[in-house]
Design a protein with these regions (language model features):
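Cell-envelope and extracellular/periplasmic
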Residues: 1-285
Length: 285
């Protein structure tokens, strides 16, 4: 897609190893800069691709003299059990990589882990991934809310992920206009009068679907028990009203905050919305 659109050759240098941890792609110095990171615990992992700095030494250092436009990153499952430091680790890694490529603002685009059963920590990992958008300047995300498969760890439609990476790069790195870089990102949630108003950003033409039910929303009251909620678009804006008959006095709203879910909220270009929650509770099924 980049070749066809830009009319110039575009190459990709691939450094990858399935099931790797983010720590393996980082230098010892970058790892030590992350407060709370436990080296002994990381070194105890049995899988070679999860050992600290191993893939950094073998697959990043040998290529850091090549010039490049930016980075594409698709990883996360290898850190699903220690997700709490993921955003900090990724921020430190990107800072280090940009230093080595001598470009402090080098674009860094990453894919969200897709839905799929297997580990209850996945929604928390995804939350950390989305948090990186605010922590890493000039970063972007490929949302994969619609690409999962119930009993698979990874998205089976890898070609669609690649196309969305291309769309993101064309919009952000190459400044092309006329299409959004990604799906709807959460701007804010206001809960009042028994309902929630959910507002999205970077969605100038509004949300979809407009003609049938929007799925994936849940609400909870003081008992912290979540129930499916109904959502409707407000006047063709990037705004939703979310309500739930079973929860007359809601205090929390979630969207797609499970390991496995099926949702249908997108922008008018068909790019899916991000998962989110307004609470900080640990109850996830």
């Amino acid at each position: 897609m980049l070749n066809e659109t830009l009319h110039v050759p575009v190459g990709i240098i691939v450094s990858c190893w399935g099931g790797s941890s983010i720590e393996s792609w980082m230098s010892p110095e970058a790892l030590q800069s992350v407060d709370g990171w436990d080296r002994k615990q990381a070194e105890a992992r049995k899988k070679i691709q999860q050992r600290p700095s191993l893939l950094y030494n073998g697959m990043i250092t040998p290529i850091n003299k090549f010039s490049a436009k930016g980075f594409l990153w698709s990883q996360g499952e290898g850190n699903i059990q220690n997700y709490k430091l993921y955003a900090q680790l990724k921020t430190a890694m990107v800072k280090q990589w940009r230093t080595e490529w001598k470009n402090p603002n080098m674009p860094f685009y990453f894919a969200m882990s897709a839905p799929g059963k297997g580990h209850k920590g996945k929604p928390f990992l995804v939350e950390q991934q989305i948090k990186c958008l605010d922590m890493i300047p000039n970063s972007g995300i490929v949302l994969t809310t619609d690409l999962g498969k119930e009993f698979e760890y990874h998205y089976p439609q890898a070609n669609i992920v690649g196309e969305r990476f291309a769309i993101l790069a064309l919009s952000e790195a190459y400044q092309m206009k006329g299409f959004p870089a990604h799906g709807p990102l959460l701007e804010g949630v206001v809960i009042e009068n028994g309902r929630a108003i959910v507002t999205y950003k970077d969605t100038p033409l509004g949300l979809c679907p407009t003609s049938y039910n929007i799925t994936g929303f849940e609400m909870a009251g003081a008992d912290r028990k979540f129930h499916p909620a109904k959502a409707r678009i407000v006047d063709k804006e990037a705004k939703l009203v979310v309500e739930c008959e079973e929860v007359p006095e809601p205090i929390a709203v979630r969207y797609a905050f499970h390991s496995w879910y099926e949702t249908n909220l997108t922008n008018t270009f068909g790019l899916p919305a991000q998962p989110f929650r307004t609470d900080n509770w640990d109850n996830v099924e």
